[in-house]
A protein has these predicted regions:
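C-terminal subdomain of the subtilisin-like protease fold in secreted/lumenal serine endopeptidases
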Residues: 5, 348-353, 429-430, 501-575
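Beta-strand/beta-sandwich contexts
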Residues: 19-54, 96-125
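Inhibitory N-terminal propeptides of secreted protease zymogens
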Residues: 47-49, 57, 64-71, 90, ...
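Surface-exposed, short loops/turns at beta-strand junctions within beta-sandwich domains
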Residues: 80-86, 176
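Protease zymogen maturation seam
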Residues: 109-125, 184-250, 258, 262-264, ...
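Subtilisin-like serine protease catalytic core
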Residues: 122, 234-274, 280-335, 346, ...
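Extracellular S/T/G-rich loop segment that most often corresponds to the catalytic His/Ser-adjacent loop
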Residues: 255-257, 420-499, 503
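Substrate-binding/access-modulating region of protease and related hydrolase catalytic domains
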Residues: 326-427, 476-488
Length: 575
């Protein structure tokens, strides 16, 4: 009797707690048969649901209740392929609107391993045990070959990145010895180009932990080194005055989630109007998370002393930017590429990749071994083939897309393809960003000594440009540092440039960024790189052919104002 009484008391209390929780979409994933051509099933995990079904909106259309099934805090949606297309999805209930998330109708989806499907390898890294991906040679029918291989080895095809001819298999193995033996056999198939094994490792570098600067940084000064506010003022005033017909743009951010309870994102609810800056993302529960900070630099709302994001700050002059935060699944690099393929097929023009990995055994500029975000040689060889296939596909099918990637925080070299991915790839469509910080010298902003190379930033000729690496999201907040936070400054600049002149190619974007760049560091002699060279040195061709220009040989520092000015000029100049 006492237990029944306690239960009756607790039920209304739990309902009251649920009612107090804000409505949030915490997870959205394709479920069921990922390869089927029929109706798609999507599973949502939602916080703050009360009794009954919420209204589900896909774009500007509500879904019929017959397409929505609820089980506890999970909603399952069934979508007919011909009737719906990729669009933001959000919920509405009891006067509340949830955060909007992006629901893609594209075909690239992979599975993450469960806790019982991973093991420790000889390098001490967590590796997937029974889930691998195969890259099929391009002249073969990928799905047919993957199914043939699966049938031959008793495996099952469970996921795919179809445009790249990549298919995920679940292997009938129980330990790493069996897995590695089967990988060797599958890799020897004539139709298989590579086998991709997923691994993960803890982040022990700068971005894996909150850093406290001594003395604390001044956020305005850090971004002033890249002329952040000057660029905002220029776009707000010059663009309307010169009647430049700016175009809306979609930006993809490869991150897990954004905390919509953080002040910078509390205003993003429900539908987003035309001409506004929109953020579509799953809800996280950490305001200091990597995804929240990276997205905040792009599109966070400012206030109460906290800096706002660049795209949001453009105000009414902006044509409308859609920032889509997406990672497909927690399946490592393979999921990052699957999400990137879907985003590009959904019309994203700029991709922000604030991630990268080192091979086990990579050494920094001081000769010490890099211990953060490392992967085994087996995993790196598969990732290299996967990334190469992605950039080949991008060049062939979407040559106008720009990928902006962080150089990394191992104090190592970005361009050594045997030790660092993806920044080592040489392609016009990949911009690599290093990190700098304000120096302690009282010099003019234009001086090369106004900033100094961030000690942990990766370096060398493959780094195209550098930007401020440290952020302080709130006046009393902790400081975060790393090239991950320099990268969205460049992404935002590139997005604004393309909104001004959508005809710019990736190679032209790189050229304008470097021609407009401020400098940092000493002049170099164009010999082999040493630890002082943050980026590729400024060349005479990037300074109107002036052989005695003082910028020559120095590293490039992002100048957001001048980059936008050159983008405006490029509309009238034919090269």
């Amino acid at each position: 009797m006492l237990r029944l009484l306690v239960l009756l008391i607790c039920l209304p209390l739990s309902a009251a707690v649920a009612a107090q929780q804000p409505l949030r979409i915490q997870q959205l994933q394709r479920c069921g048969d990922l390869l089927g051509e029929g109706p798609q099933r999507w599973c949502l995990r939602v916080q703050g649901l009360e009794q009954g079904k919420p209204a589900v909106w896909l774009g500007d259309q509500p879904l019929s209740e017959t397409h929505v099934v609820r089980q506890g805090d999970t909603l399952t949606l069934t979508l007919d392929p011909p009737r719906q297309r990729s669009a933001p999805l959000w919920l509405e209930a009891r006067g509340q609107r949830s955060n909007p998330v992006w629901l893609t109708r594209q075909r690239s989806h992979v599975l993450a391993a469960g806790p019982d499907e991973v093991a420790k390898n000889m390098d001490g890294l967590t590796t997937y045990l029974n889930l691998v991906s195969v890259l099929i040679e391009e002249h073969h029918d990928g799905l047919r070959q993957a199914q043939r291989i699966a049938d031959k080895y008793g495996a099952q095809v469970v996921g795919a990145i179809a445009p790249l001819n990549v298919y995920q298999l679940r292997l009938p193995v129980h330990d790493l010895v069996q897995r590695d033996a089967m990988i060797l056999r599958i890799g020897s198939e004539t139709s298989v180009d590579a086998v991709i094994v997923e691994e993960s490792a803890p982040e022990r570098g700068e971005e894996g932990a909150v850093q406290v600067a001594k003395p604390p940084i001044d956020q305005a000064q850090e971004w002033a080194a890249n002329r952040f506010m000057d660029a905002l003022y220029y776009y707000q005033r010059r663009i309307p005055a010169s009647k430049v017909p700016v175009k809306p743009l979609r930006i993809g951010v490869i991150e897990r989630a954004v905390d919509f309870d953080a002040p910078a994102f509390m205003a993003y609810r429900g539908a987003c109007g035309a001409g506004e800056t929109c953020v579509y993302a799953r809800d996280g529960d950490q305001a200091q998370s990597h995804g929240t900070q990276v997205t905040g630099i792009l599109a966070g709302r400012g206030g109460e002393g906290a800096p706002g994001g660049f795209l949001t700050g453009l105000g009414k002059a902006a044509p409308g930017f859609e920032v889509i935060v997406e990672r497909n699944a927690d399946a490592g690099i393979t999921a990052n590429i699957a999400a990137s393929v879907n985003l590009v097929e959904d019309g994203v023009r700029v991709l922000n990749w604030s991630w990268g990995i080192h091979r086990v055994g990579a050494r920094d500029v001081r000769g010490d071994e890099v211990d953060s975000l490392v992967r085994s040689g087996l995993a790196m060889s598969g990732y290299e083939e996967l990334l190469e296939e992605f950039f080949l596909w991008l060049r062939k099918a979407h040559p106008d897309v720009v990928v902006v990637n962080s150089a990394g925080n191992g104090a190592s070299w970005s361009g050594r393809d045997e030790y660092r991915l993806p920044s080592s790839f040489i392609t016009d469509q990949l911009l690599v960003v290093g990190g700098h910080q304000r120096s302690d010298q009282a010099v003019a902003l234009e001086s090369p000594t106004h900033v100094t190379k961030r000690r942990s930033s990766n370096v060398d000729m493959r780094v195209d440009i550098s930007a401020a690496a440290c952020i302080r999201p709130a006046p009393q907040g902790r400081v975060h540092c790393g090239t991950s936070y320099a990268t969205p400054l460049v992404t935002a600049t590139v997005a604004a440039m393309l909104s001004i002149n959508p005809q710019l190619t990736p190679d032209q974007v790189r050229m304008l960024l470097r021609r407009s760049a401020l400098t940092l560091g000493p002049q170099q002699d164009f010999e082999a790189m040493d630890a002082e060279d943050l980026t590729a040195p400024i060349l005479p061709s990037e300074r109107n052919g002036q052989l005695q220009h003082p910028d020559l040989g120095r590293s490039a520092r992002l100048d957001m104002l001048r980059a936008l000015d050159l983008a405006v000029q490029s509309r009238e100049r034919v090269r």
